[in-house]
UniProtKB/Swiss-Prot annotation:
It comes from Shewanella woodyi (strain ATCC 51908 / MS32). The gene is acpS. SUPFAM superfamilies: 4'-phosphopantetheinyl transferase. This is Holo-[acyl-carrier-protein] synthase. Belongs to the P-Pant transferase superfamily. AcpS family. Its cofactor is Mg(2+). InterPro entries: 4-PPantetheinyl_Trfase_dom (IPR008278), 4-PPantetheinyl_Trfase_dom_sf (IPR037143), ACPS (IPR002582), Ppantetheine-prot_Trfase_dom (IPR004568). Transfers the 4'-phosphopantetheine moiety from coenzyme A to a Ser of acyl-carrier-protein.
Amino acid sequence: MIVGLGTDIAEIERIEQKVPAAGDIKGLESCRLAKRVLTEPEMAIFIASKQPARYLAKRFAAKEAAAKALGTGIGRGVSFQHIEISNDTNGAPLISFNGGAADRLASLGGARAHISIADEKHYATATVILES
């Protein structure tokens, strides 16, 4: 049974305005938006990315979609740091929860989470489905 559904869209150009260029290691390491949104493993990928703004936009949309699926949004016991997006060996996105997000998922009776992330020239979008 579906216990949560969330979707979000992020404008890549808005993220680009806040993110240093690829290859600017010091700038990327100190990027305030990235430090707020990304977990440590995600941050390492962001810094090494050839398209860091696009990577961050996709993670931002994914985490916002997850927070909506949890029914809390970001800030009511759930932070960006409580949601982590990784990829399986085929490149498909995976989502995991910790802290307040894991607590909220458990309170919903959630046992599985599904995520889809897509991006085009101007936008990144994500959808999260939580199942019991």
